[in-house]
């Protein structure tokens, strides 16, 4: 049976109004990550149906361990009519606060891929109102193809989450691109050698494989 909206957070953290530091991020299920995204010390709930990053929602946590109403990430990011909003959430810097990679793009109606209107790596904490970050920086994920999905991956074999990008490369091409994370800096820029090693070229009729269990490599189930 589904847990009521105001029930305690899985994994536990601040209870009975006690303002304690949030516990480490954990998985409520395969598509739901619980962790502190806004930096208030209380875990928030990030739901990612289908693991594509395009239908992500956030429920902000409170001091008593409950979660609020669902907010669509696309709306918080200010996606315009016709735009596709993609997001990936993880503690890329392993500092205890979740971070986000975002991409906003209007899908192309021809052979050439569209360039992203917004493509950023946003280290946490993020503002609740619009998911902005005081230390946001441009990400080149929107410069090398039209992003269709963003997924967490484990390519480096270390403790730092990496990024898998499913993108339209134009003229029927559909590729898996990658960005590996470096300690302290978040997902890096395009690297041809890494793209050859970990990426995959495909087409719309024969798309590349994409990771579906990225969070599981880095986060344990909530107790």
Q: Which residue ranges define each predicted feature?
A:
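Beta-propeller-forming repeat regions
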Residues: 1-223
